[in-house]
Amino acid sequence: MARGTALLGLTSLLLGLVNGQKPGETKEVHPQLTTFRCTKKGGCKPATNYIVLDSLSHPIHRAEGLGWGNCGDWGNPPPKDVCPDVESCAKNCIMEGIPDYSQYGVTTNGTSLRLQHILPDGRVPSPRVYLLDKTERRYEMLHLTGFEFTFDVDATKLPCGMNSALYLSEMHPTGAKSKHNPGGAYYGTGYCDAQCFVTPFINGLGNIEGKGSCCNEMDIWEANSRASHVAPHVCNKKGLYLCEGEECAFEGVCDKNGCGWNPYRVNVTDYYGRGEEFKVNTLKPFTVVTQFLANRKGKLEKIHRFYVQDGKIIESFYTNKEGIPYTNMIEDEFCAATGSRKYMELGATQGMGEALTRGMVLAMSIWWDQGGNMEWLDHGEAGPCAKGEGAPSNVVQVEPFPEVTYTNLRWGEIGSTYQEVQKPKPKPGPGPRSD
């Protein structure tokens, strides 16, 4: 999630509960998801993956005899009575498994992953999940510099104010599994992003000193049916970094705003939206293709986004704004011209590529913004939504049960994950009759 307002979006799912460090007795059952690895020569081959909810979503309770209460709240270190030190946290906080992910708004069906923001009983799980490898003990590490990532999406139930996010985070492959974090990736530990949030546990360990959790973040997709946004966020540190004080702030070690790619921000208002008048019609499912284009030395130079719908390739839009280079890709010249100062200072596109080369974890979520109504994504210069239209109270009037479905996650060589369906040429009809 690419904005500080993500914090407000998450509080509804936390309900005062955060991840414990000692697994409990309730079984964890991960939904299975079929994904694909692609080459131009061999096509796309299926692979087995699993989905795990973020550790913050798992049920938590204090160990027996420690009284009622949780093990901490978002934005703060854990309470000292149960977490005076890391070792005590590991003993005193019990994290239970989740036997039925559907109760948290997460279901899979073959190649499809469905995330529900609101359940029929009114609960708001706002799930965030990660992609596990076939062992279920490690995250699937994506190395995408010089490659492309593609998925199909149904965004029809995402009105103004909603955000379906699919992005990459430079988390540890095991979720930083350790003596005091025995669950690791199996329980969804180790989250970080470029916002450097403070959470009671970082890498599964009690965050006694209240540090922030920072790492490189590549927002492949943050969107609803009215607006879309792509943004690389770089940090000048490798992997998960524990920040303190000013390091966690805007001028710190990570680029919080990113270099954003949104058609509305460059005066292209007919490219993406609900209806046939838009090139990408979000009233129907479509395919999202993101290419991470490298030079001959293997350094990331450009990020190229385009779509496929109804069998036709919809090429990326070109910028249409004075002072902005005429381009249809994210590249350093564009980022510098749009005021992405921190992005340029902290490593720019090459720095993002270095993280993509080291390997990043795929995260997927759905959320709303109780504080800012997601207006950074879809209002004003960013999109067509009216002021206040994205308030949660209005979202449920437009769509009582917001959800998103991601299907056919696939990645591989440039040009290997998508195809344009060529319509057959009409056969010549019979010649004129000569009666």
Curated annotation (Swiss-Prot):
Primary location: secreted
GO cellular component: extracellular region
Glycan-linked positions: N109, N267
Gene3D superfamilies: Glycoside hydrolase, family 7, domain (2.70.100.10)
Disulphide-bonded residues: C38-C44, C71-C93, C83-C89, C160-C385, C192-C215, C196-C214, C235-C254, C243-C248, C259-C335
Top-level EC class as recorded in UniProt: hydrolase
Protein's UniProt keywords contain Transferase: no
The entry's keywords: Carbohydrate metabolism, Cellulose degradation, Disulfide bond, Glycoprotein, Glycosidase, Hydrolase, Polysaccharide degradation, Pyrrolidone carboxylic acid, Secreted, Signal
Catalytic activity: Endohydrolysis of (1->4)-beta-D-glucosidic linkages in cellulose, lichenin and cereal beta-D-glucans
Pfam families for the chain: Glyco_hydro_7 (PF00840)
UniProt cross-references to InterPro entries, sorted A to Z: ConA-like_dom_sf, Glyco_hydro_7, Glyco_hydro_7_sf
Signal peptide range in chain numbering: 1-20
UniProt-listed CDD domains: GH7_CBH_EG
Cellular localisation: Secreted
Protein name per Swiss-Prot or TrEMBL: Endoglucanase EG-1
Species per Swiss-Prot/TrEMBL record: Humicola insolens
Gene: EG-1
